[in-house]
């Protein structure tokens, strides 16, 4: 909520959105438009954490620029789904970027000889965006196969991009993680009672079948 002019509280100086969200959900464009319109009326800038903006664009069937147009500044990640080894991009007006570069220098965030990183980033932008739909399809395939395992509940309302969230009402999480490690698969334990799996360019449909077989075995034995 945007604060009013009550003298007891500071004014709202920035609205931050994330699309796609780390929960796996994609914000609809109608919501983005509403927030941006309200922010402009109140003269409050909007920053978009677009670490997964290209995944959101694929999910919505639109260009990433359309999503970015409903924010004053955007950050997007070159690793994650795009596959670069490191790096993010900050996007905004010329004046904004000038101030950001100054701030980066003040904070000691500059990097020397970073051209090789830029080369990987260019490759990610030019070659990797068009294949993100494959990751989304693999996530849905993974979700479908996981549902065939007794005791698994897929969070279907959060299956918008390349993330699969699920709950498992059997087996001991720590034992399952250890058993999979012995089978050559590393997996994070659940946060609370919720597991998260993410598909990417390094995970093939064959890899998913292998994982499902070994995960099923681990669940039954633990």
Task: State where each predicted segment sits.
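Conserved PLP-enzyme active-site core in the AAT-like
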Residues: 1-170, 174-183, 187-194, 198-203, ...
């Amino acid at each position: 909520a945007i604060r009013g002019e009550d003298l007891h509280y500071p004014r709202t100086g920035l609205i931050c959105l994330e699309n796609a969200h780390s929960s796996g959900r994609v914000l609809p464009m109608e919501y983005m438009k509403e927030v941006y319109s309200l922010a402009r009326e109140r003269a409050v800038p909007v920053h978009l954490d677009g670490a997964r903006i290209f995944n959101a664009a694929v999910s919505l069937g639109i260009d990433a620029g359309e999503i970015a147009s409903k924010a004053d500044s955007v950050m997007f990640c070159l690793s994650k789904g795009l596959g670069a080894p490191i790096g993010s991009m900050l996007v905004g007006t010329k004046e904004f970027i000038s101030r950001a570069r100054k701030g980066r220098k003040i904070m000691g965030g500059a990097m020397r000889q970073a051209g090789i990183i830029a080369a990987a980033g260019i490759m990610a932008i030019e070659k990797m965006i068009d294949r993100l739909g494959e990751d989304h399809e693999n996530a849905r395939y993974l979700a479908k196969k996981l549902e065939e395992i007794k005791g698994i509940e897929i969070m279907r309302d959060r299956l918008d991009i390349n993330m699969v969230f699920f709950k498992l009402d059997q087996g001991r999480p720590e034992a399952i993680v250890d058993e999979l490690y012995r089978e050559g698969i590393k997996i994070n334990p659940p946060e609370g009672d919720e597991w998260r799996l993410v598909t990417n360019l390094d995970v093939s449909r064959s890899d998913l079948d292998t994982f499902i077989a070994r995960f099923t075995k681990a669940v039954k034995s633990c």
